[in-house]
Amino acid sequence: LIIKKEQLEMIKKRLPLTAIMDTRKHIEVCFTPGEYAYYKDEFEIVVVIDVLRATSAICAAFDNGIEAIIPVPTVEEAWEYKQKGYLAGAERKGQIVEGFDFGNSPFSYMKEEFRGKEVVLTTTNGTKSLDVAKDAEIVVVGSFLNLDILSKWLAEQNKNVLCLCSGWQDKFNLEDTICAGAISDYLISTGQFTSVEDSSIAAKYLYLSAKDNYLGYLKSSSHRRRLKNLNLNEDIKYCLTPNQTDVIPILKNGKLVKL
């Protein structure tokens, strides 16, 4: 297709100047891993978010000296690693799977036995998202725990960013979306990023509504109630407390390591 100079000028006249000159990168939000296929080819960086609790636990683990985490989507894969002698954790529906010693509580990874070790982990939602996104150019882990350091790092990369919310069993949830909205709000505030999807706009406004009191805002959210019923209140408070670490876990050759 050849466009003549006169035709190009006509096109330019019909478009706003900002549409022609806009060189900003995109930051968008995907609510669930089930929707990822609609976004995957447009973004160089994918931020996987599972606030309650997988990505929070992963950040806590690296903050406490773990060497690497191998995320796997199924309990069967985690069990195979355990049989080979690996420290292996498995969580389903908020509880530790029978036969495993730990799940996805961030406090589990603060024990001395984890320092310098390579650990295998499978969870209901977070490791599924990591598996879905594994072929992206760059995959990093996001949570409230590393919110500021991650947002600043993303701003420096000059790449399109997708926040992939893990949700709950392929359904929307509030806490992941609010965290994604916080990242989106920061990146847009730099002037280097823009977003056009309604999911991103919704995430940003949810964040702005919740930012002064995450715990209070999420008191009636489905997953917070689910974990509260399992007596995991301390986990909830910890996971909703921002900026407790400066680590950014990144996926390299199938393993999460510290950036």
Name what the model sees in each region.
Residues 15, 101-128, 132-138, 152, ...:
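Long, charged alpha-helical interface segments
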Residues 29-39, 54-66, 76-119, 123, ...:
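Residues that scaffold, gate, or flank divalent-cation-dependent active/transport sites
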